[in-house]
Structures are given as structure tokens and as C-alpha cells.
Curated annotation (Swiss-Prot):
Quaternary assembly: Homodimer.
General function of this protein: Destroys superoxide anion radicals which are normally produced within the cells and which are toxic to biological systems.
Organism: Bacillus anthracis
InterPro entries for the chain: Mn/Fe_SOD, Mn/Fe_SOD_BS, Mn/Fe_SOD_C, Mn/Fe_SOD_N, Mn/Fe_SOD_N_sf, SOD_C_sf
Protein name: Superoxide dismutase [Mn] 2
Entry superkingdom: Bacteria
Keywords from the named record: Manganese, Metal-binding, Oxidoreductase
Cofactor(s) annotated in UniProt: Mn(2+)
Single Gene Ontology MF annotation: metal ion binding
Cofactor note: Binds 1 Mn(2+) ion per subunit.
Residues that coordinate or bind Mn(2+): 28, 83, 165, 169
Source organism phylogeny: Bacteria, Bacillati, Bacillota, Bacilli, Bacillales
């Protein structure tokens, strides 16, 4: 049986305070994300030929899956992927400005870090309903985009480097309807060391 696992966080639920409260984080990770993982495993249970596929392989090739599980994999696999990256690119010691190679390419494609912040914040805040704002590698270029529901940039052939979750369950207990305030505060949690590592990995993967 396919057995995707809920990832363990590298920080405690209260360590992203005051920007993300511990109650929200514990429910978001321990309940919402866990449900996506369980539902994904259930969808794949009877398809042994898919049990050795990575999450990225499944999401990049949805059109090749049995039609009766496409929606379940898209929604729950997407939810697992999006949340896993969301946790990964945050840190109690986050915030500040980008460093390393990714800082240079951000300056190249956005002119300044503030321009990136502005564009990504607008993409996240203006996403109607539920979804995500992303910084992605598109070929050799960096760009900003947003996706609805649990869709990922992988489905468009782009490599995600940074993501913010703007589903209401990501912020409503603390911020209620104040999504812009949540997005502004979220920047204080961004783990730029990890974003830089993901950029370098993405560039390397494109060489193979």
C-alpha cells in the first residue's frame, strides 16, 4: 500500500508566534494536513502500480492516472504537497532578506526584494476564495503566481520555491478576515536559507 506520511515539523507549534499562533498551527498541521495524507493514501490503496510513484510524479502526470482517482489525487496529493512546502519554508528564525544565489536572481528578475514581496503579497491577497501564492522557477526565470484550491505549479511545469497558504484555515483563528495582515506578518517567518537550497536543487535538477 502507498503510505505517504505527515511530515514532522522542524519547530514546535508555538515557535512561529506571534505571526502564526500555536492553535492555528496545531490544527492546520495535525488535522487539515493529516486528512489530506490519509485521503491520498486511501485513494491510491487499490492501485499497486502507483505505490512507488513520488508525490511529484503523481501531480505532474494527473492525466495518466485512472480517471476515478484523478480528482482525489489532485486535491489530496496537492494538499499534501502544498502544506509540506509551506512548513518547510518557514522557521522561528525566519524573516529578513534573501541570501545566497536566490537573492541574486530575485534582484535580477524583480529588481528589488521589495518588488518581489509586493508582487507575491498581491498574488496571495487577491486569490479569490482558497489557494496559494507562489515564487516559482519557470525554466531559468523566477516568477510569481497563484493557484486555486490545492492546485500546484507542478501541473504547469514550474518548480515551486516558496509558498504562502491563504486558505482561511491558515489564518482565520487569529486574523479572521484580515488576510492582508496575515500575509504581511508571514514574511517574518520565511526561511531564506531553505528557499536558497530549493533554488539550487531546482537548477541542478534541470541539468539532468
Amino acid at each position: 500500500m502507498s503510505s505517504f506520511q505527515l511530515p514532522k515539523l522542524s519547530y514546535d507549534y508555538d515557535e512561529l508566534e506571534p505571526y502564526i499562533d500555536s492553535n492555528t498551527l496545531s490544527i492546520h498541521h495535525g488535522k487539515h494536513h493529516a486528512t489530506y495524507v490519509n485521503n491520498l493514501n486511501a485513494a491510491l490503496e487499490n492501485y499497486s502500480e502507483l505505490h512507488n510513484k513520488s508525490l511529484e510524479e503523481l501531480l505532474c502526470n494527473l492525466e495518466t492516472l485512472p480517471k476515478e482517482i484523478v480528482t482525489a489525487v489532485r486535491n489530496n496529493g496537492g494538499g499534501h504537497y502544498c502544506h509540506s512546502l509551506f512548513w518547510e519554508v518557514m522557521s522561528p528564525r525566519g524573516g529578513g532578506e534573501p541570501n545566497g544565489d536566490v537573492a541574486k536572481v530575485i534582484d535580477y528578475y524583480f529588481n528589488t526584494f521589495d518588488n518581489l514581496k509586493d508582487q507575491l503579497s498581491k498574488a496571495a491577497i487577491s486569490r479569490f476564495g482558497s489557494g496559494y501564492g507562489w515564487l516559482v522557477l519557470d525554466g531559468e526565470e523566477l516568477s510569481v503566481m497563484s493557484t486555486p484550491n490545492q492546485d500546484t505549479p507542478l501541473q504547469e511545469g514550474k518548480i515551486p520555491l516558496l509558498v504562502i497558504d491563504v486558505w482561511e484555515h491558515a489564518y482565520y483563528l487569529k486574523y479572521q478576515n484580515r488576510r492582508p495582515e496575515f500575509v504581511t506578518n508571514w514574511w517574518h517567518t520565511v526561511n531564506w536559507d531553505r528557499v536558497n537550497e530549493k533554488y539550487l536543487q531546482a537548477i541542478q535538477s534541470q541539468k539532468h
